[in-house]
């Protein structure tokens, strides 16, 4: 078998990862009186097995990656120790609402029949869930929008969360927001910062923002502590309507006692809004010496 697969083996000649280009039946056809099941057993004995691609590589790490993570940890400890609100927020990947397959499985007497193809034209709409996770309270709120995932939508989702949860922080004068480095709430978009200024003015809060460094968005707390349980709860359940989606989100919990609220946001958010230089100069924004492009406070 080793000689048979030698010419069909690819991979790094100096590394440990190798693969066989031929199928089991093709290999079996090259040997008399050997079935493909026998070929499978022999390949396993040689250390081969079926494997899928793994999305793990995120490019070279930014030189300030560790420095930024240490800064975020210090800020989070500072806010939590003082009893001030600290949240992790982001937008979940958008979902087609309709009779479409939803990855995962669930216990039932028979599987649901869904559309064979995920055509946008067959969907009622495309829904984007923006989640806000309270790092101290183990509580989450999800704002489900049906238009663009913009800076306005992101900040409004945080605004809605604050209106619901501010009673839990009656003496708060500041808010920490942990977000990733890209998307509508990334460190580059001007609209995100302008809307945060409006939120700060409305709420009389000093808003401190810390962005995750490049390639580290999967470490954001909202991904694991809110979106992960939500995905598990609706796994295998077609999101045939917005109400089904909202109920699945609201019914999410875990062993840590997670509680989640959700609401529908039908506002039409305009895309491609330009924020001018004069508008940016009006923002009351300060930056620390540590990674100033990723950290700032708006008051």
List the predicted regions and their residue ranges.
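Short, conserved catalytic/metal-binding motifs centered on acidic residues
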Residues: 1, 27, 39, 90, ...
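A short, amphipathic alpha-helix used for macromolecular contacts
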Residues: 1-34
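Extended hydrophobic secondary-structure segments that form protein cores and membrane-embedded regions
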Residues: 21-22, 88, 174-181, 209-214, ...
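Charge-mixed, compositionally biased segments that are often intrinsically disordered regulatory tracts
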Residues: 37-113
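Electropositive, glycine- and tryptophan-enriched low-complexity nucleic-acid-binding patches
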Residues: 112-178, 183
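C-terminal accessory extensions appended to soluble enzyme cores
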Residues: 167, 236-299
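RNase H-like two-metal-ion nuclease catalytic core shared by retroviral integrases
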Residues: 187, 209-231
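Two-metal-ion acidic nuclease core segments, chiefly of the RNase H-like superfamily
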Residues: 192-209
